[in-house]
Design a protein with these regions (language model features):
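Glycine-rich beta-alpha loop elements in corrinoid/cobalamin-binding modules
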Residues: 118, 125, 134-270, 506
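N-terminal [4Fe-4S]-dependent radical SAM core
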Residues: 76-81, 92-97, 247, 253-310
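Flexible glycine/acidic-rich beta-alpha junction loops that bind and position SAM and/or redox cofactors
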Residues: 91-93, 201-202, 316, 328-329, ...
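Canonical Radical SAM [4Fe-4S] cluster-binding loop centered on the CxxxCxxC motif
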Residues: 298-341
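Short glycine-rich His-centered loop
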Residues: 81-111
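Radical SAM enzyme core and accessory elements
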Residues: 5, 9, 70-83, 132, ...
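Catalytic cores of alpha/beta
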Residues: 204-207, 467-482
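Conserved SAM/AdoMet-binding glycine-rich loop
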Residues: 79-84, 163, 192, 341-456, ...
Length: 823
């Protein structure tokens, strides 16, 4: 399981799932987001041309860092930084791809238009430091506007820098294609990448001509501010950016094209310097008068889900998770979890629910922080939560009934989510979840549902994990039947399953050591992953094959398990009969379509894309809600008068001032109304030894999780939680995952003295990198891509009006004009 908004990289099994069903109040829903009421033509813009004019002698760092932050300055010509969120596959509107169930367990569509929460924290951090920043959700724009011309709209953006997130690996195709277009349209504007996947593939990315900078690590607010300050100063003064070797976590090119990899040394100890109160996106929409480009995902207005993050990092070590303790230690330089102060977490929740009435999900199991943190957080919520609230846990909460009694005593309603991955304890142990047994999980489900304030308990399974066979997957239905019998078919228990797709997480233990965990990789480098994103279906796109079941067996077993679970829920009233019948029909149609696809691919002649074109409409219909209805996971919520009042107050306090600023030529910051301190580096052992070699020997000390974060160590001060499964201090639970931890410790030790690449926290030995499986279908499609590009140019993503030839000619003319100016 991976938290979609937070540490884990891939959105196929994360905490933020579509748990909400918006009540149908058309009149009230009109004011669901006051921003939407004013974000309509002719006021909506794709990128307003504004700039700060510095007062003589003023430093960017001297600008307000907190409070009202209503700093205004004369408008000049452009934004300082624009974050662009690309679709997973850039030209998805032209291609025929059967995405299948890859996004069934998350709120977004298969193009993963939901941008990471980190974009909002970065923008807010920039704004409180005096820079102008905005989010431009290109994927959302492409989904919402059928005729949206990508290149035309990107050409209108005016910014001193562009940033593209590559946090979740499925964006590997779209992010690069958008970067190429931006560099064509704005050849002198630097482009930076960031996110967990960017951190892992920073050397691959910096090799692209269209990328100038790559940031590594999970907390780059301050390093990025340092770079933005240099770039803005250089552009305003007409001087070179200069040497950037003092900016931590940065991979960059100098003016000669030489690549530099700065130390991965910026790793804050806590999450207290960033804003998680949603002030920035709400104020940003009102300021830009542009709602669609800020929209988190398709359907958000009817489904306004929000998240509160407890931490960055993890004390657990699931084998296939790119957000595990192993991944954070070896790829992101983090030796301990960075916790958010529970008081700030409570304030975040209070502030969000003032303006958004959808459910709030608390991500990243806060029980890892220990009992003191847990008690302060839960008790602090008493009387303050009016929205539905859900908690993600990585296992049965210690204390059982006592813990649920505490939830009942402080919250009027609450929900729980746990991803067990498999009903088979042996499979779960191989995955890294041997610290509890399914019998314990069953007990905690019964205990939770016995409490009157428990709204629901969501349980998730996943196919494709280590040592899992097709037979084991098909046994899931029988286990679910047993589980429902035990809770007397309580409809508050919601069970779902989905595949580990499209990718095995890069940076995970299993990705770095595939043979050890029973995998063969179809892709290892960034470019190999990028190429796979245009393949015809989710089973072809996958970057791995398991030794325990073939890809075809996995697809069939996934559909079988989904059919069984759906049938059980339909027969016993857990799911509406009509909805159950619709899901059953769609799963069977999806399976039939996959068989038809195989027939077209392997028995047809001619170009693959031509053969696939006839299937596009059916692919699109069957690539959402494939194995389940998203609405099945929806929690009912109510709109309260206080929501409308707070929205009205937000509009009154911002809209007139923003309009006045536009008329007078000034800029109004969208920074949070709360004061936050500057981000500071952590005091943990550095990621680098004095001689420049990676430091992989750090041992922590025990702490209770308050203030300075939960160190990954046991009572003896030995670093064991970096290999996963120790329980937070204060909770007496046996570590039943010792064998799994020992195996990973052995793998970790085997990395010492290997051919470490400068800049990697701990490099993968060359012997482990190996070669990937040969894929004839991919080879044929890439040959066809090359032939088509040579004769006709690349596919256009400009919508119905975006002919590639015309756009390419226009771009060439613009580029030639810019070059003539330089000469």
């Amino acid at each position: 399981m991976r938290p979609l908004f937070a540490a884990g990289q891939y959105p196929h099994g994360g905490m933020i799932r579509p748990l909400i069903r918006a009540n149908r109040f058309p009149a009230l829903r009109k004011c669901q987001n006051i921003c939407g009421l004013i974000a309509s033509p002719p006021f909506a813009s794709t990128g307003i041309s504004v700039d700060f004019k510095r007062t003589q002698g003023e430093s960017t760092c001297d600008r307000p860092r907190g409070g009202e932050n209503a700093y205004t300055a004369p408008i000049m010509d452009k934004l300082d930084f624009t974050f662009i969120h690309a679709p997973a596959t850039y030209d998805f509107r032209e291609r025929s791809i059967m995405y299948g169930p890859v996004s069934d367990m998350v709120p977004s569509t298969p193009i993963f238009e939901m941008y990471p929460l980190g974009l909002t924290t970065l923008c807010e951090y920039f704004e409180r430091n005096g820079f102008r920043a905005r989010i431009y959700n290109l994927a959302s724009m492409m989904l919402h506007k059928k005729n949206f011309d990508v290149e035309k709209n990107l050409a209108r953006l005016e910014s001193r820098m562009f940033g593209i997130d590559l946090h979740w690996m499925p964006h590997c195709h779209g992010s690069i294609e958008v970067a190429k277009i931006l560099k064509r349209l704005h050849p002198h504007v630097p482009i930076s990448f960031g996110g967990l996947s960017s951190s892992i593939f920073h050397e691959d990315l910096i090799a692209y001509d269209c990328i100038d900078y790559v940031f590594r690590g999970d907390s780059t607010e301050e390093p990025m501010r340092m770079l933005v300050e240099r770039v803005v100063r250089a552009q305003k003064t007409g001087t070179p950016v200069g040497d950037l070797s003092d900016i931590p976590n940065l991979t960059w090119k100098d003016k000669t094209g030489r690549v530099h990899i700065n130390p991965l040394s910026w790793v804050p100890d806590d999450m207290n310097a960033i804003s998680m109160d949603y002030d920035y996106p709400m104020k940003g929409v009102l300021r830009q008068l542009d709602f669609t480009s800020y929209l988190p995902m398709k359907g958000w207005l009817q489904y306004p889900v929000t998240a509160s993050l407890t931490c960055r990092g993890c004390a657990r070590n699931c084998a296939t998770c790119g957000g595990s303790a192993y991944a954070f230690k070896n790829h992101f330089g983090r030796r301990k979890v960075a916790w958010r102060d529970p008081k700030l977490l409570i304030r975040d929740i209070e502030h969000v629910q003032n303006h958004v009435w959808g459910p709030i999900f608390v991500l990243n199991d806060f029980l890892q922080a220990g009992p003191a943190y847990t008690e302060q957080f839960i008790c602090g919520l008493k009387g303050k939560v009016q929205n539905p609230i859900g908690f993600e846990f990585f296992g049965p909460p210690p204390g059982g009934n006592d813990f649920y009694n505490m939830l009942d005593a402080n919250l009027k309603s609450w929900s729980v989510e746990i991803s067990a991955e498999s009903h088979d304890d042996d499979v779960r142990s191989a995955f890294g979840k041997g610290h509890y047994k399914m019998a314990e999980l069953e007990d905690t489900i019964v205990e939770a549902l016995s409490h009157p304030n428990c709204d629901r308990f969501d349980l998730y399974f996943m196919t494709g994990i280590p040592k899992q066979t097709a037979a084991s997957v098909r046994e899931t239905g029988a286990y679910v039947q047993h589980l429902y019998e035990r809770v007397n078919y309580d409809p508050r228990l919601v069970v779902m399953t989905s595949p580990m797709a499209p990718f095995l997480d890069v940076g995970s233990i299993a990705f770095d050591n595939p043979e050890h965990y029973g995998y063969k990789l179809r892709a290892r480098t960034f470019e190999e992953h990028r190429q796979r994103m245009i393949l015809p279906s989710w089973k072809h796109i996958m970057n791995y094959e398991s030794d325990y079941m073939s890809v075809d067996e996995m697809v069939d077993a996934t559909y079988d398990a989904a059919l069984d679970i759906n049938r059980i829920k339909g027969e016993h009233g857990i799911l509406d009969p009509a909805m159950s019948a619709a899901v059953d029909k769609r799963v069977r149609e999806a399976r039939e379509q996959m068989n038809r696809l195989d027939d077209v691919l392997y028995n047809g002649t001619g170009r693959i894309d031509t053969r696939m074109a006839a299937l596009k409409e059916e692919f699109e219909r069957l690539s959402e809600n494939t194995v389940a209805e998203k609405s099945e996971l929806n929690l009912a919520f109510n709109i309260k008068p206080t929501h409308a009042l707070h929205l009205a107050k937000l509009g009154v306090s911002n809209v007139p001032a923003n309009l006045a600023n536009r008329l007078t030529g000034t800029w109004r910051s969208a920074a949070s109304e709360f004061a936050y301190p500057p981000q500071k580096n952590g005091v943990q052992a550095p990621a680098w030894n004095p001689d420049g070699t990676p430091n992989c020997t750090f041992k922590g000390v025990v702490t209770d999780g308050m203030g300075d974060g939960r160190l990954l160590a046991n009572d003896a001060g030995e670093q064991v939680a970096a290999f996963g499964s120790v329980v937070a201090p204060g909770f007496a639970r046996e570590n039943t995952n010792a064998a799994f931890d020992a195996e990973n410790a052995e793998l970790e030790a085997g990395r010492a003295g290997t051919d470490a690449v400068v800049g990697d926290a701990c490099a993968i030995p060359a012997a482990q990198r190996g070669s990937v499986m040969r894929d004839p279908l991919l080879e044929q499609m890439m040959a066809e891509e090359a032939e088509r590009t040579e004769h006709h140019g690349p596919l256009s993503a400009g919508g119905l009006k975006g002919a590639a030839g015309r756009a390419g000619a226009r771009d060439a003319r613009k580029l030639n004009k810019l070059r003539r100016r330089e000469q």
